[in-house]
From Swiss-Prot:
Name of the protein: BTB/POZ domain-containing protein At3g08570
Similarity comment: Belongs to the NPH3 family.
SUPFAM superfamilies noted in UniProt: POZ domain (SSF54695)
Disulfide bonds: none
Pfam families: BTB (PF00651), NPH3 (PF03000)
Top-level taxon: Eukaryota
Source organism of this protein record: Arabidopsis thaliana (Mouse-ear cress)
Domain notes: The BTB/POZ domain mediates the interaction with some component of ubiquitin ligase complexes.
InterPro entries named among the record's database cross-references: BTB/POZ_dom (IPR000210), NPH3/RPT2-like (IPR043454), NPH3_dom (IPR027356), SKP1/BTB/POZ_sf (IPR011333)
Organism classification: Eukaryota, Viridiplantae, Streptophyta, Embryophyta, Tracheophyta
Biological role: May act as a substrate-specific adapter of an E3 ubiquitin-protein ligase complex (CUL3-RBX1-BTB) which mediates the ubiquitination and subsequent proteasomal degradation of target proteins.
């Protein structure tokens, strides 16, 4: 009789006699006076056995013997093809038929159960037959433990024929047992933590909610996918599922760097396996956010092994959902094709498209919902904040890829113009990126330079950037003139008495005149912050220029004292000259400050000719 035991107290299969001695051993012990009357061949090995104990428990052998009698064929020789587990498992099944005890273990229970099903060792022929014994072991031992259920499922992978275990529904039951046990352990761990409170102690293997992750990594991808799907159905935490997916991917795809070398040896088998693994893992992602670094890693691997387009688009969509938290290193995706640019800007462009689509959908949803104004403004502010973060990241990304000589102007401009104007409070970062692109692509003609510089809003450049523009010989003259003109207009506005308080009051008045229209943070909050910052910068510049004018006034007085004989003529000439170069067109009411400021601007332009910087930053 077969023994269901975890202890090796009975005769083990490893200590069984060789097949050539197998039948004679049974004959001397049980049927010492009866010679073997049937020979069964399994995987090329012959077993000389007795019909009586076999037909008493094996329905298949009983049918075979009956058919041989009817056909008057050789009654003493037959072959069992595609026997589950091979000759070793058949030997254990024969031991059971002869009443010899052996050990059923986690490693052999699947093979024995499938062999019993193949031989039709059901209760119809004998009570407590081999199928019933193995089922009892599975239910009472294997399926009650997550770890043992995983081992049983792993043994299903190596069994031949591969689909024989499915006929007994063993993989399905293993999958459900793993999912149920994982959820049970998650619940038990939570309750134990509540009972323990703040008490400290060493964590055992079962105290960690994800201790089983390492065990699942040994599964084949199709079985692993079934386990993860079952865990999601039974309510396992998404964090645990994501952690398991990340660990499985790292273990399964860690040899991807040598993928090209391996594919030459095995005709693409390794690459196909990696592709199937990656696509399956992506399809198992829960709705919760997956860590960005892991998503970018999967995307890089997917590009390398050329995964399906749908898989790449799903990864790009998930990255776009949390693009505001991305780092510059994540965006620098190398190109795998030779002769192209260094970085994959097309992928980044698609990610930006998905991100902007998400922002647009969120804004439309907020408009459709009848929430209070505070809630609407808060949601809009969050969207605008995400846009500003992405704008800063993209400026850094543009500056990083700009020196690449293989990067085309068309792709560079496409990355710039995809973001709206309100995604940047200041254009200093954009100007820096464009300047680096011009420096790395000296062959651009004047028209191409103009089309590139048109994206820079001169009103959103800091004083430092404006000073750099005025001395940058890589820029078209039209760009320099626009910056100088913007500087003059800003100075005129500052000196005419416009202040931040006036802008704020004007904005509030405009809002009060349109009470039915919801104020968009994109149009008010960001613009007010930008204008306040510009006003502070203008005030600082005015103070510096006033100091310079005071110094110039002292120098002028000293010169007039030295040339007292021509003092009146010199003063008259200076007054006329300053009046002619007055930019604002003001009369005497404008004061000496504006006239002297024009002289300072002329001196700045003369300095431009003397020195040209190589780079802004």
């Amino acid at each position: 009789m077969g023994i269901i035991s975890d202890n090796a107290q009975s005769h083990s299969s490893s200590s069984a006699p060789a097949p050539s001695i197998f039948s004679s051993s049974f004959a001397t012990r049980i049927f010492s006076d009866v010679a073997g009357d049937i020979t069964i061949v399994v995987d090329g090995e012959s077993f000389l056995l007795h019909k009586f104990p076999l037909v008493a428990r094996c329905g298949k052998i009983r049918k075979m013997v009956a058919e041989m009698k009817e056909s008057s064929s050789n009654l003493s020789h037959t072959e069992l093809r595609d026997f589950p587990g091979g000759s070793k498992t058949f030997e254990l099944a024969m031991k059971f038929c002869y009443g010899i005890n052996f050990e059923i273990t986690i490693s052999n229970v699947v093979a024995i159960r499938c062999a019993a099903g193949y031989l039709e060792m059901t209760e119809d022929f004998k009570e407590e037959n081999l199928i019933a014994r193995t089922e009892t072991y599975l239910e009472q031992v294997a399926f009650r433990s997550l770890e043992k259920s995983v081992e049983v499922l792993c043994s299903c992978e190596t069994l031949y024929p591969q689909d024989i275990a499915e006929t007994a529904h063993i993989p399905d039951r293993c999958v459900e047992a793993i999912a149920v046990n994982a959820c049970r352990e998650q619940l038990v761990l939570g309750l134990s933590r509540l009972n323990r409170g703040t008490e400290s102690g060493e964590l055992k293997r079962g105290d960690s909610p994800e201790w089983w992750i390492e065990d699942l990594s040994a599964l084949r991808i199709d079985y692993y996918a079934r386990v993860v799907s079952a865990m999601a159905r039974t309510g396992l935490r998404s964090e645990s599922i994501i952690t398991s997916l990340m660990h499985y991917a790292q273990e399964s795809l860690k040899g991807i760097r040598n993928c090209k070398e391996r594919t030459k040896l095995d005709s693409g088998t390794f690459e196909n396996e990696q592709r199937n693994v990656l696509e399956a893992i992506v399809s198992l992602f829960p709705n919760d956010n997956v860590p960005l670094s892991f998503l970018f890693g999967m995307l890089r691997v997917g590009i390398t092994i050329n995964v399906a387009i749908s898989c790449r688009l799903e990864l790009e969509r998930r990255i776009a959902q949390q693009l505001e938290t991305v780092s510059l290193d994540d965006l620098l995706i190398p190109v795998v094709r030779d002769g192209d640019s260094m970085y994959d800007v097309d992928t980044v462009h698609r990610i930006l498209v998905c991100f902007l689509k998400k922002i647009e959908e969120e804004e439309e949803y907020d408009e459709d919902c009848c929430y209070e104004n505070e809630t609407e403004n808060l949601t809009g502010s969050m969207c605008h904040s995400s846009l500003l973060k992405v704008g800063r990241i993209m400026d850094a990304y543009l500056a990083e890829i700009a020196p690449d000589p293989c990067l085309s102007l068309h792709k560079f401009m496409a990355l710039i113009e995809i973001l709206p104007d309100y995604a940047r409070v200041m254009d200093d970062g954009l100007y820096r990126a464009i300047d680096m692109f011009l420096k790395g692509h000296p062959s651009l003609n004047e028209q191409e330079c103009k089309s590139l510089c048109k994206f820079i809003d001169t009103q959103k450049l800091s004083q430092e950037a404006c000073n750099h523009v005025a001395q940058n010989d890589r820029l078209p003259m039209q760009m320099v003139v626009r910056v100088l003109y913007s500087e003059q207009l800003r100075m005129k506005n500052v000196m005419s008495g416009e202040s931040g308080e006036g802008l704020l009051l004007s904005s509030q008045k405009h809002s009060s005149e349109n009470p039915s229209r919801a104020v968009s943070p994109r149009d008010t909050y960001a613009s007010l912050r930008r204008e306040n910052r510009e006003l502070k910068l203008e005030i600082s510049r005015v103070r510096v220029r006033l100091t310079e004018l005071e110094k110039e006034q002292i120098l002028m007085k000293q010169g007039m004292m030295e040339k007292s004989g021509h003092g009146g003529t010199l003063l008259t000439s200076l007054s006329k000259g300053i009046g002619r170069i007055s930019i604002f067109g003001g009369g005497p009411t404008e004061g000496k400050l504006r006239n002297a400021n024009r002289k300072s601007k002329s001196r700045l332009e003369r300095k431009t000719v003397r020195s040209r910087p190589e780079s802004m930053f």
